[in-house]
């Protein structure tokens, strides 16, 4: 059985998602209210997920610090990015490595009926993430690992 958890720092978004889940009759989905940096320090969430997917909310280094601590060793992190993210991926190599990951693939595509490019960057988790990551709230975005 597939279980899904939706994490967000804003209750407003989670309330909306809970309404959608209820109206559509979706099962095995929970919403979790934490900042990414804080939730990843909770034993019940840290390195518990086979796959973590993010929307494009930050640069790749920051997204890795937000998301890789949630991924089990052997699992994957999929980052949704705008455009061709190759330069951003190159800048994030150190962060990916420090957090226990390795870039596995990047899939580039255009949104249907448009010429708007997007990317899915797939990072495989090879080693546990050090307990020092993620750093305290705000630091991953202010001072990305480079």
Where are these regions (language model features)?
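Short, small-residue-biased leader/transition segments that mark boundaries at the very start
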Residues: 1-2
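Helix-to-beta-strand junctions that scaffold the AdoMet/dcAdoMet cofactor pocket
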Residues: 26, 71-73
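Short alpha-helix immediately C-terminal to the canonical SAM-binding loop
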Residues: 13-15, 85, 89
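SAM/dcSAM-binding transferase cores
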Residues: 90-146
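A short, conserved alpha-helix within the catalytic core of class I
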Residues: 58-67
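S-adenosyl-L-methionine
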Residues: 7-48
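Short SAM/SAH-binding signature in class I
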Residues: 47-56
């Amino acid at each position: 059985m597939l279980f899904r958890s939706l994490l967000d720092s804003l209750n407003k978004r989670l309330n909306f998602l809970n309404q959608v889940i209820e109206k559509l009759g979706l099962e095995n989905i929970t919403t979790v209210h934490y900042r990414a940096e804080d939730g990843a320090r909770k034993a019940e969430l840290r390195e518990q997920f086979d796959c973590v997917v993010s929307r494009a909310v930050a640069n790749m280094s920051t997204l890795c610090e937000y998301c890789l601590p949630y991924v089990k060793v052997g699992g994957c992190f999929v980052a949704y990015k705008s455009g061709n993210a190759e330069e951003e991926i190159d800048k994030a190599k150190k962060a990916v490595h420090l957090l226990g990951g390795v870039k596995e693939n990047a899939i580039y595509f255009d949104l249907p009926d448009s010429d708007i490019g997007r990317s899915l960057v797939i990072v495989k988790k090879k080693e546990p993430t050090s307990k020092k990551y993620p750093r305290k709230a705000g630091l991953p975005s202010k001072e990305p690992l480079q």
